[in-house]
């Protein structure tokens, strides 16, 4: 098979690590370089590698990550894709030099409307995250009516 064609096929089938928009030590002292190195460099890389090893020859072979998470049944493909998506969202939301410490605009208004205050939101969000046994994810999401919800999910 042509090397260029093979390379293009691998590029289409391969899920890649997101590039961090900051240095691995840029979030210190809130998140240590050791934590970033471990969770980004080891955990996330393992999930990406696992996903790339699992999808060839399946209906998910040429699917994007969101489609895989939305359509794959519980199992190894779903779990690894879910962890890749969750870790990617997690790591890409941070900034070493945030411009403000609280949300503004429409998000701030929605938080005040649905949680009473930003302080109440933080308390509820932290309680949801701390209430997870083992590994998992706490998310702020919005429903089709625009109402904010805190959800938590174990693992992927």
Predicted features and spans:
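Feature for soluble, non-membrane regions of globular proteins
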Residues: 6-8, 12-156
């Amino acid at each position: 098979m042509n090397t260029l064609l093979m390379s293009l096929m691998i590029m289409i089938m391969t899920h890649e690590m997101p590039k961090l928009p900051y240095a691995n030590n840029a979030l210190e002292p809130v998140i240590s370089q050791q934590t970033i190195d471990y969770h980004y460099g080891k955990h996330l890389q393992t999930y990406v590698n696992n996903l790339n090893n699992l999808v060839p020859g399946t209906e998910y072979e040429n699917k994007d990550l969101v489609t895989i998470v939305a359509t794959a049944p519980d199992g190894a493909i779903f779990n690894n894709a879910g962890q890749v998506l969750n870790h990617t969202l997690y790591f890409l939301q941070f900034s070493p030099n945030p411009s403000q410490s609280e949300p503004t605009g429409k998000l701030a208004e929605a938080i005040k409307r649905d949680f009473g205050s930003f302080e109440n939101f933080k308390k509820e969000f932290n309680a949801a995250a701390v209430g997870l046994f083992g590994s998992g994810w706490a998310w702020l999401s919005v429903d089709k009516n625009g109402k904010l919800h805190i959800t938590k999910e174990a693992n992927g």
